[in-house]
Amino acid sequence: MTVKKADVLLVGGGVMSTTLGTMLMQLDPSLNIVMVERLDHVAHESTYGWNNAGTGHAGYCELNYTPETGDGDIEITRALAINASFEVSLQFWSYLVERGGLPSPDEFINTCPHESFVWGESDIAFLRKRHQLLSAHHLFKDMEFSDDPRTLQDWMPLVMEHRDPMQKVAATRVRYGSDVDFGSLTRNMVEHLQKNANFELLLSHPVKSLKQTSDGRWNVQLSDSRNGGSKTIDAGFVFLGAGGGALPLLQKSGIAEGDGYGGFPVSGQWLVCKKPDIVKRHYAKVYGKAAIGAPPMSVPHLDTRIINGEPALLFGPYAGFTTKFLKTGSSFDLFGSIRANNFGPIMSVGINNMDLTRYLIKEAMQSHSDRVKSLLNYFPEAKEDDWTLAEAGQRVQIIKRDAQGRGKLEFGTELVASKDGTLAALLGASPGASVAVKAMVDVIERCFKDRLSSADWTAKLKEMIPSYGESLVDNAELLHSVRSRTLSVLGLDKKRL
């Protein structure tokens, strides 16, 4: 059996692993890095263009990031944090573009206004107050608000055409929002990594087992599903960035920090339109409010998508119930993840979230006509024949123990790392890929503390991410500086012709 030594083993060929590998190779090109992917291509699960919405999540249009509190206030803390995190991604991508590590920005990111759209007096009041609170902060100072139908006709013509003129509507807009093809971004970063002789990519190599040895390193067994046989990687550090597949791998590792975690898988579907005469009439990501009782991941939105240079429209998502952790996974994934240490939390979440489960099952059983009826709220003239149904990627929400030992369901991402810093796993979903760079900086800070204490690594991180070590939420001058640069380098300051 072949045994290969590696300083770093990246499990999963998606945006998370690729971002970490790219950052580490910039910090120390002599590192021996191996990436393993169970499929025969990188970026084919959640990172693949049509498996996600491609929204550069910045909190501009996503109303679920600014929830109303019990006393009628609006909490904006999460929106500020997500916006600042996305600015970190933009800085790193700009750095790579400037140094040839990424191609022309329009191959992976395009300007696409981010807009929120609501109707009815109560939701309009909410949106107006949200705008007042957010636009008072430097991160959101360019956000516009309007309840004038003529202005909205200019912002989102497809949404406003043939709408009831008596219906009260309102919207906000940030002109320099973005549509990101995370598949293209990831493939290009992998191609650049492959130019370094110290990087190796192993496709069609799923992980069968991983075990820590007495010297603190990791013995990782791989199977070669293309040619047969197996390989062993002897790794100093392992990152589990396998999307929904990260939880089962974390469980295989046996680290104590992974005890109690479970996964709640949610499937997704989109309505897609590629008819040029319709696509050309909409150029924005228009987000609404989730229906009462709907989970946060089901916020409806009508989006411009540009994947492999081809424009299209997307509407959804339509969530559904599933037991798979990956789109290409097994229906037994959920059941296979149940352990003695997470059985209680999983059962607790199941019992306490029966309404959510019923909602997901109901969503999955909708007809095409039912789905198009939802679309009519955002495109009054939509015709069934113009739209087709597409399967999105899987999202595995986090189940974890609360302070009372019961289970709670979390809609976010979380980094789980071993005490000795030799293994880390990223669990969860939204906002996901948009904050990949910030998430991988967290991995470096937790698992490469000794190296990060050196002046060389700190200086290099500062070069890659000029805001590193400082708060974009608190520092308006710094935000203005980095945003001006990234909008220019990535071409996000250009108005659409």
Swiss-Prot record:
Family statement: Belongs to the MQO family.
Species assigned in the record: Hahella chejuensis (strain KCTC 2396)
Pfam families xref list: Mqo
Organism domain of life: Bacteria
Asked whether the UniProt record includes Transmembrane helix among its keywords, one would answer no
Q: Which cofactors are required for activity? A: FAD
Q: Which gene encodes it?
A: mqo
Q: Quote the protein name from its UniProt record.
A: Probable malate:quinone oxidoreductase
Enumerate the Gene Ontology biological process terms: tricarboxylic acid cycle
Q: Say which enzyme class the record assigns.
A: oxidoreductase
Q: In which pathway does it act?
A: Carbohydrate metabolism; tricarboxylic acid cycle; oxaloacetate from (S)-malate (quinone route): step 1/1
Write down the EC number.
Answer: 1.1.5.4
- NCBIfam families (alphabetical): mal_quin_oxido, PRK05257.1-1, PRK05257.1-4, PRK05257.2-1, PRK05257.2-4, PRK05257.3-2, PRK05257.3-4, PRK13339.1
Which key words are in the record? Answer: FAD, Flavoprotein, Oxidoreductase, Tricarboxylic acid cycle
Q: Which reaction does it catalyse?
A: (S)-malate + a quinone = a quinol + oxaloacetate
Q: Which cysteines are joined by disulfide bonds?
A: none
One GO MF term: 2-hydroxyglutarate dehydrogenase activity
Keyword Metal-binding included in the entry's annotation:
no
